[in-house]
Amino acid sequence: MLTTTFVILGIAVLLGSLLAVLYLRTEGAAAPWPLAALHGLVAIGGLFCLALALRGPLRGVEQGTASFGIIAVTLIGSAALIGVGSLVTHLLKRRLPGILIGVHATLAVGGFAILAAYVLVG
């Protein structure tokens, strides 16, 4: 289950990277909404799967990575909250601040990196 979660969140990271490239190349124009919606749905699905996978047996105790799963779900969950804030900002027809995108991406990539260590080392 944890490997499947890692793959799902990896797809969300790739979609998010594509959205970031599109945002930067079009000088802040709105990203295509179907792609943004797919990114959000895949990410939320991955977050849900990660929360379910963490209910299983403890892993990574010998390597010292036992808490990495909790850290990953916290970082990715925070990124998801900012993503929902981005959606609300878009629906209110306001310009999305660049710092919001940067914080969202930093939390998401950080959570994914911690998850990678948890899956591959733990």
Task: Walk through the language-model features, giving the residues of each.
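Membrane-embedded alpha-helical bundles that constitute the cytochrome b-like, heme-associated redox core
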Residues: M1-G122
